[in-house]
Amino acid sequence: MEAPKLDILKPVLQHIFAAFDQVEGEYPFELQSQEIGIVTSLGHGIARATGLLQVQSEELVKFPGDRMGLAFNLDPDEVGLILLDDGHSLKAGCEVQRTGRVLDVPVGEGLLGRVVDATGRPLDQRGLVTAQERRPVEREAPAIMDRAPVTVPLQTGIKAIDALIPIGRGQRELIVGDRQTGKTAIAVDTILNQKDQDVICVYCAIGQRSSAVAKLIAELRNRGAMDYCIVVVAEGEASPGLQYITPYAATTMAEYFMEQGQDVLIVYDDLIQHARAYRELSLLLRRPPGREAFPGDIFYIHARLLERATCLRPELGGGSLTALPIVETEAQNLSAYIPTNLVSITDGQIYLTPDLFQKGIFPAVDVGKSVSRVGGKAQLPAYRDVAGDLRLSYTQFEELESFARFGTRLEESTRQSLERGRRVREVLQQPQFQPLPVAEQIAVMLAVTQGQFDLVPIEQVSQAQQLIGEAIRRELPNICDRIQNAGQLSETDRETLLNWIANHILKDSDNEL
């Protein structure tokens, strides 16, 4: 009787075990381990934790309440973490969990016109950011063989810079000067001048006042610049960890467009605040201090950031990333630690002096201390022909003017040189938010360097150049188009411009002006 019962149960058991095997195949059960540590101390934007034995350098970690941080110090007994959010709700004893990944940010067309923080979270109350993909904030700079020479100009729309300190696409040009000398104004005017130039702009605000950033964003929006601009913000009250990663995150967002073959301009405002945030983190985490209490790798953190700005070879799309880092000096001390580091890293600097600013000369560019090491090769041929010797002659004029203050009797030729130099200085002045097209710049610079402004009273020079700009757009559009498209100024066009300006604008300065 027992054997028939077993025969009946056998197919039932086989069916049950087969069902078990099928479920196991469809729903694999795997144990997932999580490494969780305990926060032992917390404050001033950093935390220390134990129990994270396998955590890696700069790995993203998660605190309660979806607060995020980065592993910064890997000591034998504990891990030093930097907070990317405010830590008001955190306390010693709370858990911290590994994520197994590095910090990444959204990139793509969906960021254009948006204001975000260093983690990609929106700050403009316009909903979530739509992104093509996410990329890590720390990326390797392009290799040497992947780079191309800087040959295409980036027009700032500012005469003093485009004529004397030209910038090329893919260059790194430092803007340096004391506070309230117009550093941000130059960067903003450069962004405004990229309208209709197929250049994507990224403005990175580090440690700036919220009111100042809000005013700048409003200005960009009112002038239609936000359509091609991304603003990445870490205000002064943000955690030092967030301020530290902000320029790297902004560069990752900019690199996406560069790798798509587009030209990109990025402004870092400013890197002295970035250096101070890194110094604060390093001192709190007990890293050895060096000169001015900055850690020993402060040069490296800026070098690895700015080396990501370049011009790619045509085989890689031919895109470019132009960097305009800003750094603030104290009491015109250009030889301070961070400014000298950045001067040695970048391809030139635009130095703004408070002496010129206080005299009402805007932009307050000190031509003698400013230089562009690679931009000269990218300057438009038309501009190079017009302003080729202008830098040298203008520097000589400034020295001559200083000498003339002693009351020495001057020869007639010297007096004429002084008068022309003063008119050149007047022409180079330019109010904020009024970038000029390159054709208008060249016409005005041609007129002043050829002496056509010599008989115009200095107080009327500004009005004269405004008349020239308006008139050539209206009367000589063909020459403007040739300059804009080809960058060339033929001898015929040159003579036509000079004769037309002399006969129609400056013929009778008393009546015209």
UniProtKB/Swiss-Prot annotation:
Annotated residues for binding of ATP: G177, D178, R179, Q180, T181, G182, K183, T184
Family to which this protein belongs: Belongs to the ATPase alpha/beta chains family.
The UniProt record lists the keyword Cytoplasm: no
GO cellular component: plasma membrane-derived thylakoid membrane; proton-transporting ATP synthase complex
Record-linked InterPro entries: Alt_ATP_synth_F1_asu, ATP_synth_asu-like_sf, ATP_synth_asu_C, ATP_synth_asu_C_sf, ATP_synth_F1_a_nt-bd_dom, ATP_synth_F1_asu, ATPase_a/bsu_AS, ATPase_F1/V1/A1_a/bsu_N
Swiss-Prot/TrEMBL keywords: ATP synthesis, ATP-binding, CF(1), Hydrogen ion transport, Ion transport, Membrane, Nucleotide-binding, Plasmid, Thylakoid, Translocase, Transport
Physiological role: Produces ATP from ADP in the presence of a proton gradient across the membrane. The alpha chain is a regulatory subunit.
Species this chain originates from: Acaryochloris marina (strain MBIC 11017)
Name of the featured protein: ATP synthase subunit alpha 2
Listed transmembrane segments: none
